[in-house]
Swiss-Prot record:
Residues 48-65 have a biased composition (Pro residues). It comes from Mus musculus (Mouse). The lineage of its organism: Eukaryota, Metazoa, Chordata, Craniata, Vertebrata. This is Matrix-remodeling-associated protein 7. It is found in: Membrane. It comes from the Eukaryota. Residues 76-85 have a biased composition (Acidic residues).
Length: 178
């Protein structure tokens, strides 16, 4: 009777240990990709297992250039700390380091950043910064068409939505900056 209960109690600890092990393996495998071009520069014992792994991961390496740089940062930390818990924290740190660098160039290159414009699909106030004057006019035109269609549906279905006066319409237009 106690055996299943003990197993259920130990299950979260086992899952956590498994997650830490997987994170450590992924971090180690990612760090093994980085030394492949620099194998002549580093002849340390931790680098010795790396040469067999690069042939498997040589093809995907050129595509993710940004994450490999953050993995280079994570590699020295890995050699300093040997505990799985510490390496789990390093994995979280490397994930947080990988996220912002990919987002920052998009924000910094706001003027140079190109996107496929499709009227009526943008949300928020950032679209005003990203669009040309013609695109802004097109966006406002599409918004007006959409609001006109909404108001027409509301007038056609008075029993569902209730009466809508001209003042109500003007107030709605004011909310949409129209």
């Amino acid at each position: 009777m106690e055996s299943p209960v003990e197993l259920l109690a130990a299950l979260p600890a086992l899952v956590t240990a498994l997650a830490l092990l997987l994170a450590w393996l992924l971090l180690r495998r990612g760090a093994a990709r980085v030394p492949a071009p620099e194998s002549t520069a580093s002849d340390e014992a931790p680098g010795a297992p790396a040469p067999p792994e690069p042939p498997e991961s040589c093809a995907p390496e050129p595509a993710p250039e940004g994450p490999s740089q953050s993995e280079r940062v994570a590699e020295p930390e890995e050699s300093e700390a040997e505990e799985p818990a510490a390496e789990g924290r390093q994995d979280e740190d490397s994930d947080s380091e990988m996220g912002p660098p990919t987002e920052e160039p998009e924000e910094e290159d706001g003027a140079a950043f190109s996107f496929k414009y499709s009227p009526g699909q943008l949300r928020g106030s950032q679209y005003k910064k990203m669009m040309t004057k013609e695109e802004l006019e097109e966006e406002h035109r599409v918004q007006k068409e959409q609001l006109a269609a909404i108001f027409k549906l509301m007038k056609d279905n008075k029993d569902t939505f209730g009466e809508m006066s001209d003042g109500d319409m003007q107030e709605q237009l004011r909310l949409y900056d129209m």
